[in-house]
Amino acid sequence: MRVVIQRVNHAAVRIDGETVGQIPKGLLLLVGLAEGDGEEQVVKAADKIAKMRIFEDEAGKTNLGIKDVGGQILSVSQFTLLADTKRGNRPSFVHAMRPPKSSQLWEEFNQELVKRGLTVETGEFGADMKVELENDGPFTIVLDL
């Protein structure tokens, strides 16, 4: 499982010009699920993200978590995060989990975040989406589990 975590001032995801998810200040999560991922990875990722202190306090130190700042999450499924680029010029996605299992696991991940008291908006699994965001920092972390 790979999650790209971006601290944002705001973010939105659109499909065919219609906004399907948007947040003010918070985290944009780009979520890639690999073959072999399961509940263990989903729970660990949700725990880590819910507790991660990546927002600045009054002194400018990254001491605050998403709940401390009243932030929200926009979760977007992105299988291309599992691209293998070692050979040739065309990325291979053989390590990415296939639907419908990947769709179900992504939904479970989002529910685990909600269970931890977070407000979660989402894109639409498998759709061609346009993601708009304003990075804060920028502050981006890649979480591999």
Curated annotation (Swiss-Prot):
Chain positions of motif Gly-cisPro motif, important for rejection of L-amino acids = 137-138
Q: Does the keyword tRNA-binding apply?
A: yes
Catalytic reaction annotation: glycyl-tRNA(Ala) + H2O = tRNA(Ala) + glycine + H(+); a D-aminoacyl-tRNA + H2O = a tRNA + a D-alpha-amino acid + H(+)
Report the SUPFAM superfamilies cross-referenced here. Answer: DTD-like
Q: What does this protein do?
A: An aminoacyl-tRNA editing enzyme that deacylates mischarged D-aminoacyl-tRNAs. Also deacylates mischarged glycyl-tRNA(Ala), protecting cells against glycine mischarging by AlaRS. Acts via tRNA-based rather than protein-based catalysis; rejects L-amino acids rather than detecting D-amino acids in the active site. By recycling D-aminoacyl-tRNA to D-amino acids and free tRNA molecules, this enzyme counteracts the toxicity associated with the formation of D-aminoacyl-tRNA entities in vivo and helps enforce protein L-homochirality.
Keyword terms: Cytoplasm, Hydrolase, RNA-binding, tRNA-binding
Q: Which family does it belong to?
A: Belongs to the DTD family.
**PANTHER family, per this entry?**
D-AMINOACYL-TRNA DEACYLASE 1, D-TYROSYL-TRNA TYR DEACYLASE
Instruction: Name the principal localization, coarsely classed.
Output: cytoplasm
Enumerate the subcellular locations listed in this protein's record, separating them with semicolons. Answer: Cytoplasm
Which top EC class applies here? hydrolase
Q: What is this protein called?
A: D-aminoacyl-tRNA deacylase
Gene3D superfamilies named in the record: D-tyrosyl-tRNA(Tyr) deacylase
- The species this protein belongs to is Lactobacillus delbrueckii subsp. bulgaricus (strain ATCC BAA-365 / Lb-18)
List its EC numbers.
3.1.1.96
Q: Name one GO molecular function term.
A: D-tyrosyl-tRNA(Tyr) deacylase activity
Q: Disulphide bridges in this chain? A: none
Q: Which gene encodes it?
A: dtd
**A single GO BP:** D-amino acid catabolic process
What quaternary arrangement does the UniProt entry report?
Homodimer.
Q: Which InterPro entries match?
A: Daa-tRNA_deacyls_DTD (IPR003732), DTD-like_sf (IPR023509)
Spell out the HAMAP family in the cross-references. Deacylase_Dtd (MF_00518)
Q: Which GO terms describe its cellular component?
A: cytoplasm
Notes concerning its domains: A Gly-cisPro motif from one monomer fits into the active site of the other monomer to allow specific chiral rejection of L-amino acids.
